[in-house]
Structure formats: C-alpha cells, structure tokens
Amino acid sequence: MFVDQVNIYVKAGDGGRGQVAFRREKYVPDGGPAGGDGGHGAHVVLEVDEGLRTLMDFRYKRHFKAVQGENGMSKGMHGRKAEHLVVKVPPGTVVYDDDTDAVIADLVHHGQQAIVAKGGRGGRGNSRFATPANPAPEHAENGEPGEEKYLKLELKMLADVGLVGFPSVGKSTMLSIVSAARPKIGAYHFTTITPNIGVVETEDSRSFVMADLPGLIEGASEGVGLGHQFLRHVERTKVIVHVIDMSGMEGRDPIDDYNIINKELADYNLRLTERPQVVVANKMDMPDAEANLEAFKEAFPDLEVFAISAATRQGLRDLLFRIADLVDATPEFGLEELEEKTATPRVVYGYEAPEAGFTVSKDEDDCFVIKGPRIEKLFTMTNFMREESIKRFARTLRQMGVDEELRKMGAIDGDVVRIRDFEFEFIESSF
C-alpha cells in the first residue's frame, strides 16, 4: 500500500527536576546547598532513511513521545540528559505544523535531520540559587515541559522525470519498457493508482529517475479524482513528460487532452509551467494516429513532439536522449518553488520572537485568568510543594507587574486568580 500523507503527534521529553539538597559531611558544618540540575529532555527528531519509500509505517504508529531528562541528585550531581527520539522518514518528506500549515522541514537527503519538537530544559538545583542574602535556599525548579505538536507529513516523491497525462495513455507501458520497473498495466482507466518509479539508462550511459504518476482528469488541480494526491508528486520533478494518446481510440481529442492537462498543472501550481516539458505522441502504431498527429502539429506548430509507440518501442531512443539532455541542463527546484499556490503567501521565518508579556481577563465565573508564555513557563517550572518556591513565584509575578494589573482590573482580597489549571486567592497584603 502506498501512503503519501499522514498526521502524527509528537511530544518531546520534559526536563528533569532540580534537586534540593545540602552538603552533609563530617567536620563540615553548614556545608551549603548541593542540589544538582535536572537533565535536558529528549528532542523528537525526524531523519531521512533512503531505504524507505512510503509513509506506511505511520499508519500503525502515530504518537511519538520522547523520554524526560534524569532528575538532579545530591552532592551537586546533575541528571543525565535524555537520548533523542529519532523517527525515520523517506526522502522527499515535507513536514507541516498541522495547526498553522507552516512548513517545518523539507527532508530530502539521506541522513538529513530536523528537530520537530524540542526537549525541555532541566530544572536548576538549589545550589544555583544561593546568594549572600540566602546562602541556603530550599528552592529548586521543575523541569521545563517538552514541546508537543500535531504534524502533517507529506511525501513528494524524488524523481528527475514525471510522466503525466490522462488515464490509459500508455505511461505505465512506457516506464516498463525503458526501465526495470514493473507497474500494473491494464486496458482500463486508473490501472495505476499509486506512483511507480524506475531508473532509466540511455545508450550513452546517462541515467535518471522516472516516475509514472496516476492518470489525471479535468479538475485534478481542485482535488477531483484524488488530483492533489497525484499532483504533489510532480512538484519535485525537473522535467515533465506529457504523454498523449494520439490514436483517439478512447474518444478523446489529443488537442483537448494537451490543453486540459496543462491547465490543471498551471492551476495547481504556476511554477510547474516553468519546468521543461517533453510532449510525447504515443500509440503511433494504431489506426488514425498519423492523421491525429498532423492535426496536433497544425494546432501547435512551435511545439516539439516525439512520436513513439511504447508497445513497439518505436521512437524511444531519441526521446530518452532528449529527456536526458533536459535533466542535465535543469537545476533542482528548492522548497520555496515547490509550495502550492495559496490565497495568501505562506511565510516561515527561522527567527524566534522573544516571549510576550501577559494578559489578564475575567471569565464567566468572575475569575481572573492570567495568560502568557513566560508566566506559564514559570508556573510549570515551580515546585509548589516547597514554600520558598511559592514565595519566589509570587515575587516574580509582582516584579512582572501582575499584581498591579490585577488591581487595575478591580481585584480585591479573596478574588480567585487562575493560571492554567491552578487557582489561588488574591491577597493584597502578601501577593
């Protein structure tokens, strides 16, 4: 089964918890803090494996959770950082954030890696918080939570040449003749329902990878007939070979077929029309093929057309030489040129903006709700089982201006304040 699109969930490892400990040795009174830091949590990493050809493995496992870092220990010993979780994907995999549809990575080359979820930082032990004013702190941090994301993986096959055309025009037959590939061939439409790949070698020892793509129909660019699934595999090809049934035995007009397929390519992605395209008039061994070819050339006098018969191998030698010339002369197309046309341009920056401040709002229960990445991170890394950690948490909120904002919103003693799933009372005298 060929699988070229899946949705998965990834969760990076949390950081290990920092330790509260003190140096306790004979003849060393008041040894001071000696709590170690927690280890960093594991990343979730996608890595290209050239031995894979589809995303089939993800049909059976879609949740990937990395391990957390080791907790800090006494005697100043830090926890071990966790080993990253490496998930193998086939070459040509494009990774999207399923919530924003932003491109996270384009994985092409064997061994190429991309971190799709970062592990959390390990919490600091109490030895990190010692100051002249507080030489023996009883405060340590929890580990930072690892990132979690829903991702969409799309496989856009890596082939130098893509065969496109209506169903039953002879694409599979042509691939089976010029390469060692053995696609399914039948006298009915949509015999090919998944892409097939073969390596073609010319008589002058040049080689290229050719993909036989399932037949397109009118409206493919809008998803008709699984058009989006088929067209995405054309995006990486350097050369498009447009195969046309010149016999007319299916009751179609070769001129109309040529115009319709090119319109679908342009509607799906305008950049596809910039690729070199080789027009192949197939089934020239059939009756009426010559007459149809003459009419086709009259309609497109400036178009280079290769007349062949895949069944009898007529004209294949010159065709393959021409394709090899174009493959050699055409550069690779980068990811920015592969992006599908959308209503608004998709922009992805590598720069990460600084964490924003916070917001205070009231919910339907008159509870004050505080939100903000920095505050929520502080909350998750605070150990509320220790009084000193709670005091430090409250002091940090006050320094950030949270208590002042609550007063502006009308908070008085006894009002409930919520951060994530944690609720506490606003007390003017101590907050």
Curated annotation (Swiss-Prot):
GO molecular function annotation: GTP binding; GTPase activity; magnesium ion binding
Domain OBG-type G, first and last residues per copy: 159-328
UniProt-annotated binding residues for GTP: 165-172, 190-194, 212-215, 282-285, 309-311
Alphabetical UniProt keywords: Cytoplasm, GTP-binding, Hydrolase, Magnesium, Metal-binding, Nucleotide-binding
All residue ranges annotated as the Obg domain in the record: 1-158
Known EC number: 3.6.5.-
Family label: Belongs to the TRAFAC class OBG-HflX-like GTPase superfamily. OBG GTPase family.
Residues in coiled coil: none
Subunit structure, as described in the record: Monomer.
Protein name: GTPase Obg
Superkingdom as given in the UniProt entry: Bacteria
Disordered: region residues: 117-145
Gene3D superfamilies: GTP-binding protein OBG, C-terminal domain, GTP1/OBG domain, P-loop containing nucleotide triphosphate hydrolases
Database matches in CDD domains: Obg (cd01898)
Gene Ontology biological process terms from the UniProt entry: ribosome biogenesis
Ranges that cross the membrane: none
Function: An essential GTPase which binds GTP, GDP and possibly (p)ppGpp with moderate affinity, with high nucleotide exchange rates and a fairly low GTP hydrolysis rate. Plays a role in control of the cell cycle, stress response, ribosome biogenesis and in those bacteria that undergo differentiation, in morphogenesis control.
Domain OCT: 350-428
Names of required cofactors: Mg(2+)
Group of enzyme by EC: hydrolase
Positions contributing to Mg(2+) binding: S172, T192
Localization: Cytoplasm
PROSITE patterns: G_OBG, GTP1_OBG, OBG, OCT
GO CC annotation terms, alphabetical: cytoplasm
